[in-house]
Regions:
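Glycan-recognition and processing domains
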Residues: 170-245, 254, 316, 327
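Alpha-helical cap/lid subdomain in secreted, periplasmic
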Residues: 4-16, 20, 25, 31-174, ...
Length: 331
């Protein structure tokens, strides 16, 4: 709807729209996929950013959310200093409950904190939905229905975004010149402003790992676009080990977590190993794109990430599998 509105509003303008949204992904994923999924498509003039819905359920801590959101803004402006950005916060039942208690949802607070720091507009659609429900204008279960809203919710989102754009366009002077945004001092030196994907072929691994150039599931579990029929580094073997050399101050993995996903142990350089269960509450029916940061706030430089498949597994998992789609590197 927004694309159609912009084309109607500016009929003499040729638009190139990039539909980069992927269900289940939050700010951490966005900060590392921004380059490939958006910026590599060409010079971007206007970018909409939303991660508030999925950040709550992703298990990503508040500091990492801030590093991610700030990294998105800074990375975008390093690509095109004149790019305009609009932050948005979509609705869910968790946010409704927070607002009922008089509390600003943490995900909304962090989106707005980054927006304020960089003088970016922020459209709080979660608060709009909550207030209309409390005013009796509609009901969540019967009308709005889901975080992927029913037509009523889609129309509400569209009208609010359109209203903001109309107000902005109507206050633009005829002689306005495009200027660069100032890349001010970050709130943290560890923001993921250089976040990117690194190829799984760069890992050094034992014979228990297999490079699959076009992975598809062997069962009937659901998948997400961009995370099926793509290259992956996979294993189902206990003890399978790999080493991934990287340069930067943060590292992680993007995996697909299905019903046989296992537990890994990992370490960076000579640190003590830590354990991470890659099985999720959705893994019994979906190969969930699952982004996990394994090291952050590191000294900027060369490091080695080591990953090993553990013998034990989640009680609900059917195996000890790990399927890595991307390594994540900030640097």
């Amino acid at each position: 709807m927004i694309c159609a509105y912009l084309q109607e509003r500016f009929p003499n303008t040729h638009f190139h729209f990039i539909a980069a949204g992927i269900p289940s992904l939050g700010s951490l994923a966005h900060s590392f996929r921004l380059q490939r999924d958006v910026l590599d498509s060409g010079k971007v003039d206007l970018m909409f950013v939303e991660a508030a819905v999925n950040d709550r359920g992703s298990g990503v801590d508040s500091a990492t959310q801030m590093h991610s959101l700030e990294g998105i803004a800074r990375h975008a402006w390093k690509s095109n200093p004149s790019m305009d950005m609009i932050f948005m916060e979509f609705a869910d039942t968790y946010k409704n409950n927070d607002y009922d208690k008089g509390t600003v949802p943490g995900e909304v607070f962090r989106h707005e904190a980054v927006a304020i720091h960089y003088n970016l507009p922020s459209i709080n659609l979660a608060k709009e939905v909550h207030d209309k429900i409390r005013n009796g204008e509609f009901d969540w279960n019967n009308d709005f229905k889901d975080i992927h809203p029913a037509p009523l919710g889609e129309e509400l989102y569209f009208e609010n975004i359109k209203k903001f754009l109309e107000l902005s366009f109507n206050h633009v002077p005829a002689d306005l010149k495009i200027t660069d945004h100032a890349l001010i001092k970050p709130t943290s030196k560890y923001s993921f402003e250089d976040g990117h994907y690194d190829d799984v072929t760069h890992a050094q691994h034992d014979a228990n790992w297999t490079y699959n150039s076009n992975w598809t599931p062997s069962n009937r579990e659901s998948t997400r676009d961009g995370f099926v029929n793509v290259p992956m580094l996979t294993t189902e073997a206990i003890g399978a080990t790999l080493k991934f050399p990287f340069t930067g101050n943060a590292v992680g993995i993007a995996v697909v977590s299905g019903d046989d996903t296992g537990i890994i142990s990992y370490s960076i350089d000579n640190d003590a190993p830590q354990r991470l269960d890659l099985y999720t509450e959705f893994s019994n029916w979906l190969y969930l794109p699952y982004y996990q940061l394994l090291g952050k706030d590191l000294k900027n430089g060369k490091h080695i990430l080591t990953i090993k498949m553990e013998k034990d597994k989640n009680l609900n998992s059917k195996g000890n599998a790990c399927r890595i789609v991307h390594f994540l590197v900030n640097g």
